[in-house]
Regions:
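Active-site Tyr-X1-5-Lys
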Residues: 1-21, 37-49
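Short-chain dehydrogenase/reductase
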Residues: 1-2, 31-39, 63-64, 93
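A short, flexible beta-alpha/helix-coil linker loop
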Residues: 22-26, 60-61
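Conserved sequence/active-site signature of Rossmann-fold short-chain dehydrogenase/reductase
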Residues: 23-25, 37, 70
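Short beta-loop-alpha junction of Rossmann-like oxidoreductase domains
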Residues: 26-29, 133
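Short, solvent-exposed loop/turn segments at secondary-structure boundaries
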Residues: 28-33, 125
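C-terminal substrate-binding subdomain of Rossmann-fold SDR/epimerase-dehydratase oxidoreductases
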Residues: 47-164
Length: 164
């Protein structure tokens, strides 16, 4: 960030940088050892018969943003010639357990049990991003809810992989 600010001053160039929270979307990877949390969770839920295993206690809090929302922000910045630096994230946080339950409901498998692997780490308890500066510029911007975003991703996943 500091280097970019210096570059802008030194060369009198317009430059912005956007710092998003955790992203998920239709074009993520679903391969074992190469996927991110939400896509790995969707695949686990899709393949689950009775239960879904998650690492740790399920208590850590996270912000997740639908990738299409980031695309809309980028388009707005370009179309409106906005030059500044922004954190980008919905103002809500969910526990890993809540995200798992939302995923199960969104995938039509709300009756699965959650198994917590307490031999695995929770990681940092909370990771928040403050988007108030972004919202002051994009006053009417609405983030896609986690429920809606995961449903969209699951619909795309089930069509692309057709693993029924």
């Amino acid at each position: 960030a500091t280097q970019m600010d210096s570059y802008v001053k030194q060369h009198n160039k317009k430059w912005s940088y956007l710092i998003p929270c955790n992203l998920y979307g239709e074009h993520d990877k679903y391969e074992e050892h190469h996927s991110h949390f939400v896509s790995a969770l969707i695949k686990k839920i899709h393949e689950a018969k009775d239960s879904v295993e998650i690492w740790g206690t399920g208590k850590p809090l996270r912000q997740f943003m639908y990738a299409g929302d980031l695309a809309r922000v980028i388009k707005y910045m370009i179309d409106n010639d906005v030059v500044d630096n922004f954190n980008i994230a919905p103002d809500y946080v969910h526990s890993i357990e809540e995200i798992t339950k939302i995923g199960m409901e969104s995938c039509g498998k709300g009756d699965l049990n959650i198994v917590y692997d307490n031999t695995k780490p929770d990681g940092q308890y909370r990771k928040d991003v403050d988007s108030s500066k972004l919202i002051s510029v994009m006053k009417d911007f609405k983030f896609t809810s986690l429920q809606e975003g995961i449903r969209r991703v699951y619909d795309n996943f089930s069509q692309r992989y057709n693993w029924y």
